[in-house]
Amino acid sequence: MAVSKLTLAATSGKSCKILLGLRLLAFSATLSAAIVMGLNKETKTFIVGKVGNTPIQATFTAKFDHTPAFVFFVVANAMVSFHNLLMIALQIFGGKMEFTGFRLLSVAILDMLNVTLISAAANAAAFMAEVGKNGNKHARWDKICDRFATYCDHGAGALIAAFAGVILMLIISAASISRLVQPNKCCSTTASPSVVP
């Protein structure tokens, strides 16, 4: 019986470190997606016409906040980053606080809500990126990526980071749900093995 408790404590410590690593990766992915998209801006000057031989120039700026889907993308990724930062802080600095009962259920629910939030934001931004890249002939929306290549490249990088965050949050959410079945599987990283029954 004592050997099984030690084995369970060792497994618990390993699963805690894996979950902490996954949360750190998800935090990094979602934060980088929010920062890259939030700073995404490109300004170019184009010739829009001619008066005689004199070209008429106009300056246009492509910014993330010109599209509501990209604003939603930045806000959602920032919220998921903040959630993961709080969970990391609780796991590292939580002392001997056990995640059981309502606390465990609330963490699992928050993880599932964050998966939904970041998935919706990434898909909305991916749709708008597709319109920006290829346009929409039926709606007569012109593509812009042939004119604002850097803007589109930065947006693509943010989307890649966000979809990596979606995958990581799915794994974290599955781990949170599995902890509902085995509540003492992962407590704080600083908790002693004697906490595990």
UniProtKB/Swiss-Prot annotation:
Pfam families hit by this protein: CASP_dom (PF04535)
Side Extracellular, residues: 39-69, 128-156
**What is the membrane topology noted in the UniProt record heading this document?**
Multi-pass membrane protein
Keyword Membrane included in the entry's annotation: yes
List where in the cell it is found: Cell membrane
Residues in the Cytoplasmic compartment per record: 2-17, 91-106, 178-197
Protein's name in the database:
CASP-like protein 1B1
